């Protein structure tokens, strides 16, 4: 740090003028007393253009990085809080949700919150996920226990043949035809999205439609409130770039929609014939069939 700046920090501290306005004002007066040739090119050029500024942002934050107590004083004088809850409207394009934020939807309003401020988002010490509006404790960190979630190809390879575990997913595909089941293997991102939401405590009901030779998936939630945690959102948004992902509400049911914008580039070899035989042998209960039919009617109303 330049000698003139460091000495002036001591001056500001000793005189008790440690607020951000005083810091900038004092440092600015100190910099003006330095010969023009000793100033940085950026500050000099701004003064030549007739702009008036206390000090450059680079110098200001350099000071705060060396004197943390001044940074604390600066934060205390801020009038606008850094962490806020932002109201969102439906339908919501989830790509507009900034990293580090979660989404909470309820009959009382919809908001995007900072993950570390949210009581429903998992923490390292006490990882929880939300099922509806109720937190559900998980055994260990979801990502540590499911490293495959970081890769669509790996997750699909490990789960495509687990037909019983993903019974609802495959029965919903089969409600169209076996050809649609085979078509889903060309879009591994669909099973991946369903797996991510199940891993983070949700009970998703996937409903499929076909458009331009590709499958669109709408995941329905049978809850009065829906919380999409920051980690789940980042996994979906970062690993599914070929899908437009949005959240909406229809007939008091929340829907997360996955619309393909480009064909999936990942080509994962799985035993298609064996999987299709297992899917054909699945038992579809009357309750499951009714849920799929009602879900299809709801999706058609979107």
Swiss-Prot record:
Domain of life from the UniProt record: Viruses
Post-translational modification: Phosphorylated at serine residues in the N-terminus. This phosphorylation regulates the localization within the inner nuclear membrane.
Region (Disordered), start-end ranges: 1-22
ZnF (CCCH-type) ranges: 102-227
Lineage: Viruses, Duplodnaviria, Heunggongvirae, Peploviricota, Herviviricetes
The organism of origin for this protein: Human herpesvirus 8 type P (isolate GK18)
Protein task: Plays an essential role in virion nuclear egress, the first step of virion release from infected cell. Within the host nucleus, NEC1 interacts with the newly formed capsid through the vertexes and directs it to the inner nuclear membrane by associating with NEC2. Induces the budding of the capsid at the inner nuclear membrane as well as its envelopment into the perinuclear space.
One GO CC term, this protein: host cell nuclear inner membrane
Annotated Polar residues bias: 1-17
GO-annotated biological processes: viral budding from nuclear membrane
Record's keyword terms, sorted: Host membrane, Host nucleus, Membrane, Metal-binding, Phosphoprotein, Zinc, Zinc-finger
Matching Pfam families: Herpes_UL31 (PF02718)
Transmembrane segment boundaries: none
Subunit structure: Forms a heterohexameric complex with NEC2. Interacts with capsid vertex specific component 2/CVC2; this interaction directs the capsid to the host inner nuclear membrane to initiate budding.
GO molecular function: zinc ion binding
Subcellular location: Host nucleus inner membrane
Main subcellular location: host cell
Protein name: Nuclear egress protein 1
The gene coding this protein: NEC1
Protein family: Belongs to the herpesviridae NEC1 protein family.
